[in-house]
């Protein structure tokens, strides 16, 4: 996911980043489906996925919007969008644009969704107001955002803790907030959304699961920021990654991901 050139998203382009995002999306798909079911996304809806990256939830939205509906994925990253367009369903289109100030027309979507955007881009209030602008009167604005404090490994390991500190420190160091989940419900209400709903979930990962490499791989994508901020040195970086990966692949090791808060509400008519 790329937010905009004016945002604070510190994750870099590297080999494997698209695959990492697809694995993340697949792991979160059951809970995303549950949220979309509760919202009531149905045939004929017009839906927008803000910060869709190489696909985001556009596939899940496409299934529900059907042939009479429309799904738009918005992102700034041309390479992500090129990947997303390959094999996209007929009712899905992708546009390059800034999540803070897209050129999409006001009041044009039944659903505006963003995941891990408001927490990482540095100005969640501004992003939420743009999402509300794009929603139709009576339409739904939905967000999924993390609380990084629930990242925990069992049994504990020093390398895990160092990578966790590097991850949280890299985002906070550029003005992002990986604990936005804690205030997301209040943020939605303060923005004027009505009938605001709240559904948190927590992913648990074992050594054989596709998400097992999540923490090392995302810190790899933060390499420049991590080193610039002094969270790890050049020499420490590969050593800590290797030690953490070795621990995560032990059969008895498990870890919990972020707690993800799903929050959605309706735009007033």
What kind of region is each of these model predictions?
Residues 110-125:
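A short SAM/SAH-binding and catalytic strip from SAM-dependent methyltransferases
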Residues 1-18, 22-23:
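N-terminal, positively charged/glycine-rich alpha-helical extensions of SAM-dependent methyltransferases
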């Amino acid at each position: 996911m790329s937010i905009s050139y004016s945002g604070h998203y510190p994750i870099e382009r590297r080999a494997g980043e698209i695959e990492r995002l697809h694995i993340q999306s697949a792991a979160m798909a059951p809970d995303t489906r549950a949220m979309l079911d509760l919202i009531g996304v149905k045939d004929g809806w017009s839906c927008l996925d803000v910060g869709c990256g190489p696909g985001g939830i556009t596939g899940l939205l496409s299934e529900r919007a059907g042939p009479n509906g429309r799904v738009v994925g918005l992102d700034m990253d041309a390479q992500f969008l090129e990947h997303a367009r390959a094999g996209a369903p007929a009712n899905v289109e992708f546009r390059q644009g800034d999540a803070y100030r897209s050129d999409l027309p006001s009041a044009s979507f039944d659903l505006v969704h963003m995941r891990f955007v408001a927490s990482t881009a540095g100005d969640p209030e501004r992003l939420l107001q743009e999402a509300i602008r794009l929603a139709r009167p009576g339409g739904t604005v939905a967000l999924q955002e993390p609380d990084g404090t629930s990242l925990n490994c069992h049994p504990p390991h020093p390398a895990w803790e160092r990578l966790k500190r590097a991850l949280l420190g890299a985002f906070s160091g550029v003005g992002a907030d990986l604990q936005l989940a804690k205030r997301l419900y209040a943020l939605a209400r303060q923005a004027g959304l009505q009938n605001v709903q709240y559904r948190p979930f927590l992913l648990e990962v074992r050594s054989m699961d596709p998400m097992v490499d999540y923490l090392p791989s995302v810190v790899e994508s933060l390499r420049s920021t991590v080193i610039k901020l002094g969270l790890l040195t050049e020499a420490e970086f590969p050593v800590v990654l290797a030690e953490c990966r070795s621990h995560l692949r032990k059969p008895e090791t498990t870890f919990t991901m972020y707690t993800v808060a799903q929050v959605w509400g309706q735009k007033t008519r």
